[in-house]
Structure formats: C-alpha cells, structure tokens
Amino acid sequence: TPTCTLEKNNFSIKFYTPTVNIKALVDTMFVAEPETIEWIGEFEKGEIFLDVGANIGLYSLWATVSKGVRCFSFEPESLNFSILNRNIFYNNLVDKVTAYPLAVSDQVGFDFLHLSVFESGESCHSFASNKNFADQEFVPAFSQGSFSTTIDHLVETSMIPTPNHIKIDVDGIENKVINGARKILERPELKSMLIEINDDLPCDSEVKEILKDLGFILTSAPPSVLAPVKSVHNIICRR
C-alpha cells in the first residue's frame, strides 16, 4: 500500500498516497498554505475544529495530531472521502476525527456535486452548480449524487458541538456556507475562521462585509505559491 509519513515538530502523520498528485499534496503541505499551518498553531487542546472541504484530510489530521482538537470533517467527493477515512484509520484517530460525506452550503437537501475532474486529490468541484471558483461555467467530468447540510443545521440538531474554529475551502460557494451559518457565526464560542475567497467576485466581498459586521477582524494572506489564480487567497477571521 503506497503511504508516506509526514514528520514535523516531533509529530508524525501517515498518509495514503495512491497517486502522484496526492503525494505532491502531502509533500507541499507546509509550503502551499503556511498561513493555514500558522492559524492551526493558535488552536488549543480540546477545542472543536470544523473542516469544511477537507479533501484528503491534510489539515484535519495536522490540527488533531499537533494541537489535540476534536475535528469534524466534511468532504462530499467520493474518492477524496475514501482517502480521508483511510488516513483517519491509519493514524488511529477514529475518536478524534469524524468525517462525513456531505457538502456544506446554505441548503439542506439532495443535489449533484459537479466534478471538474474525476481523480482523487483534486478540487475545484461545485455543489448544486457547475460554476468554478471564478464563477465560470464548466462542463463536469462527472456529476455525483450528493447531500448538503448547513453549519446552523449541524449545530442546532446537535450533530456537532458549536465549533471554536472553522475552515471553509469549497472552491466557489464559500458565500453559501457563510449564509448557512449565520446563527453560529454570532456565538462567542466561535473564535476564528479561515476562508478561501476570490477578490474578483462580488459575493465574496459580501462575505467579508458580513464577517466584519459580526465583529470579526480580517487578515488577508497572500495567494498560495501554488495557486493558479492570484485573486484567490485565504482570509483569517478572528473575534
């Protein structure tokens, strides 16, 4: 079985690496988004971390192993979800990381997840719309049946505790995730969020205004050195 072990700061995590793409994701984890690693470094043991758009679980596992948080990961794409669970299994984290094969947006219900490419470790998929992170229509390589929930619904039905930290990386529907979390965003237990946004999209400008109005202080990170589009970058929001 192809695996590799990532070691940093006396922590080690075993990842399943069935493809060259996935091996590259693991190998570049600490250089692709250094601000994400730095942000995770602010977490405290026992806090609740919600990872929306977890992919194969790089940040879910790093936060859990390095900071001792309780993590809930959401990844609707079938191939990535399979690898995410294998990574949880390999690291004996079943009590610390729970993964759900769900999209998170502003609706609770069934729809399609439109895939940009049908390969594990890939991203730029879109739930309930075939528009990418640049708001451009694309022809899906595959449309997978999927189910969406909202952050408000998850917390209000006691599926998950109120999160202390949320990462949202969903390639274009970040605004929908925020709109489906309006009640939870007002809770003081929520300390911080990291959200991928596109400066060229009006809906993402709206997201920033909503968060400022709720009392979050926003810090912009530069685009990833690996990012194909330089208007896309992370913002970190702290109370």
Which stretches of residues belong to each language-model region?
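Short, hinge-like loop/turn segments at secondary-structure boundaries
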Residues: 89-91, 114-119, 185, 209-213
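Short N-terminal helix/helix-N-cap motif within the alpha/beta-hydrolase-1
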Residues: 58-61, 82, 109, 175-179
